[in-house]
């Protein structure tokens, strides 16, 4: 009699799945954590809601209204979820038939688009970006047949640059009546002028992902948003869990999105941008650094001589960066989160000491 293991009982695509390697999963014993694009210091909040014996609202009114006002959209165009990662998955679950439809994304980019699709059993198609990391519109057009959701990260993680807005318009015209285009704006607070939120009236098939993890300094809260037209939001509401946000999360999110919270976020952004420019200038003078790429975000991508050795050397000194070597076209590249001035100096001093 054959023995069936628990693993044999699992879905085939899950057995073959490589889980997303988050910064926390990769570990490390550092005291300078510059691998997850988090804000470097904690922000304090006081909990005001004490009704933990009751289930929370499915879509907390104060959070939705505050975010709609901040983003310049209507409350009916906002869905709140457990981080933007849940938004990525909800869009696939709502629009893609497993085993039939596909998603499309353009590497090098964020890794969760493929993981979410593979988990659900939806095909992934890739169209690598051009040499300047802009969209290959002809390549996308050639592969659109059967694609229901297209993910474009702008500013892009891990490269740090914005996607050309005219290319976004072309993509939205190419996909009209065929697919949802998802603009992942996790880092848009660092370049708010580039947001596509004002385009929702023009494009019924546009969805925008946002988060409180970056500029709002609340990565531990797990709170994200999908902005889209009401028809899209209503479909996502059919597949979201009944209570996605716990009461304490909703409480803190509403405070972070108050007028005072927005002012504090913008002050943090200004500070991070100033620190980013300081770090970019310093990196350009370091012998083991071959190239520093422009950034519109809270991280910097740079190409190094002997990048694996540099990565390990800093790791051993407790400075944890994010290795991007395995991403298409990013050979020799490491991503560095912009931290405090003290953390920047630790990185600079360690890199200057590298023998190349």
UniProtKB/Swiss-Prot annotation:
One of its GO terms (biological process) is L-histidine biosynthetic process. It comes from Escherichia coli (strain K12). Belongs to the class-II pyridoxal-phosphate-dependent aminotransferase family. Histidinol-phosphate aminotransferase subfamily. It catalyses: L-histidinol phosphate + 2-oxoglutarate = 3-(imidazol-4-yl)-2-oxopropyl phosphate + L-glutamate. Homodimer. This is Histidinol-phosphate aminotransferase. CDD domains: AAT_like. The modification N6-(pyridoxal phosphate)lysine is found at residue 214.
């Amino acid at each position: 009699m054959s023995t069936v293991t628990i693993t044999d009982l699992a879905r085939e695509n899950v057995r073959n799945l490589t889980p997303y390697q988050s910064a926390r999963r990769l570990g490390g014993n550092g005291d300078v954590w510059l691998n997850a694009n988090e804000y470097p210091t904690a922000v304090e909040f006081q909990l005001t809601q004490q009704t933990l014996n009751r289930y929370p609202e499915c879509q907390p009114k104060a959070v939705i209204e505050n975010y709609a006002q901040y983003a310049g959209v209507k409350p009916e165009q906002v869905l709140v979820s457990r981080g933007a990662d849940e938004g990525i998955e909800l869009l696939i679950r709502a629009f893609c038939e497993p085993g039939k439809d596909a998603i499309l994304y353009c590497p090098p980019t964020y890794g969760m688009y493929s993981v979410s699709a593979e988990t659900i059993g939806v095909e992934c198609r890739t169209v690598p970006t051009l040499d300047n990391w802009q969209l290959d519109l002809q390549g996308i057009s050639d592969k659109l047949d059967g694609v229901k959701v297209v993910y474009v990260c702008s500013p892009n993680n891990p490269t740090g640059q914005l996607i050309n807005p005219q290319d976004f318009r072309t993509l939205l015209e190419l996909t009209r009546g065929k697919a949802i285009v998802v603009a992942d704006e996790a880092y848009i607070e660092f370049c708010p002028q580039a947001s596509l939120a004002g385009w929702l009236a023009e494009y019924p098939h546009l969805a925008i992902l946002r988060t409180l993890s970056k500029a709002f300094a609340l990565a531990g809260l797990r709170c994200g948003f999908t902005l889209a037209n009401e028809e899209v939001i209503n479909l996502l509401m059919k597949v979201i869990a009944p209570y996605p946000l716990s009461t304490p999360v909703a409480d803190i999110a509403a405070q972070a999105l108050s007028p005072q919270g927005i002012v504090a976020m913008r002050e943090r952004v200004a500070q991070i941008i100033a620190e980013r420019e300081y770090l970019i200038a310093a990196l350009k003078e370091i012998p083991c650094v071959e190239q520093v790429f422009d950034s519109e975000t809270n991280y910097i991508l740079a190409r190094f001589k002997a990048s694996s050795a540099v990565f390990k050397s800093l790791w051993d000194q407790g400075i944890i960066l994010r290795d991007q070597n395995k991403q298409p076209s990013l050979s020799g590249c490491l991503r560095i989160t912009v931290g405090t001035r003290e953390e920047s100096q630790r990185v600079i001093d360690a890199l200057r000491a590298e023998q190349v």
